[in-house]
Amino acid sequence: MGIKFTKMHGLGNDFIVLDGVNQSIQLTVEQIQKLANRHTGIGFDQCLLIESSQTEGIDFNYRIFNADGQEVGQCGNGARCIALFARYYGLTAKNKLTVATKTTLMDLIINEDNSVSVNMGVPRLAPGEIPLLADRQSPEYSLKLNNGNTVNLHAISVGNPHAVLLVENIDTAPVNSLGQQISFHPQFPEQVNVGFMQIVNHEKINLRVYERGCGETIACGSGAVAAAAIARLFYNLSDKITVHLPGGDLCIQWPCPTAPIILTGPAAFVYEGTLLS
């Protein structure tokens, strides 16, 4: 295959990043699945592909593939990696970039400390925009599970779909079992990422996330944004929230519901390599 890649991570949410500007890259679903295997491949949560854009005002196309090969529209941790990747490898000299994903535009700012701030846009709550099959918009929805039990959750889109559940203790939350049931629930026709949120105080939440196509990851940028938005809208938290994930902390700023929500956090390089087959 002979494709150069870079392994990166954002708080342990790990990626391979591919330069589609200087290389011709066409990966199949099966190839991505094989590369994502942590025993026989490289191992990663997502595969990120940066490509040239022909659209004025957009610096790059930013494509995101989950470990199951599915292309998705949002990844906040990956966006921070893409920004540092583009500058490090000389694809741009700019510290402020605009990238286009499958579903949205994102503004990325590389800060002086090499953290990256990501404009994640304005969160959307309308069921049709999430998407969620529901008769009307509601602060909370009830889903009936296969075992007959009912679970209450919030639903929101931040460029990709998220369900958020309030729990007393994330350490004992059934993230994998319940997360999987909700992620594949037929009321979410494009599947859904599932966040389990514990409110610590007015300015901090703890969070674990089951990501569609991946399972639980130790950090999820868009999940942090979704949970912080729900916390601010329905639980009266501050306009600046620290989200503590198993992999570390992210800062979310959201001055008001009509403004874009901003995610700030680190990104790190791990190693370079070449895909041989």
Swiss-Prot record:
Protein's cellular compartments: Cytoplasm
GO biological process: lysine biosynthetic process via diaminopimelate
Site, as annotated: Important for dimerization: Y271
Entry keyword annotation includes Isomerase: yes
GO molecular function, a single term: diaminopimelate epimerase activity
Site entry (Could be important to modulate the pK values of the two catalytic cysteine residues), positions: H162, E211
Superkingdom in the source lineage: Bacteria
Pathway: Amino-acid biosynthesis; L-lysine biosynthesis via DAP pathway; DL-2,6-diaminopimelate from LL-2,6-diaminopimelate: step 1/1
Binding site for substrate: N13, Q46, N66, G76, N77, N160, N193, E211, R212, G221, S222
GO cellular component: cytosol
Keyword Amino-acid biosynthesis: yes
Enzymatic class: isomerase
Reactions mediated catalytically: (2S,6S)-2,6-diaminopimelate = meso-2,6-diaminopimelate
Active site, renumbered: C75, C220
EC number: 5.1.1.7
Family matches, as Pfam families: DAP_epimerase
Alphabetical keyword list: Amino-acid biosynthesis, Cytoplasm, Isomerase, Lysine biosynthesis
Main location: cytoplasm
Subunit record text: Homodimer.
Assigned protein family: Belongs to the diaminopimelate epimerase family.
Role description: Catalyzes the stereoinversion of LL-2,6-diaminopimelate (L,L-DAP) to meso-diaminopimelate (meso-DAP), a precursor of L-lysine and an essential component of the bacterial peptidoglycan.
Protein name: Diaminopimelate epimerase
Organism: Legionella pneumophila (strain Lens)
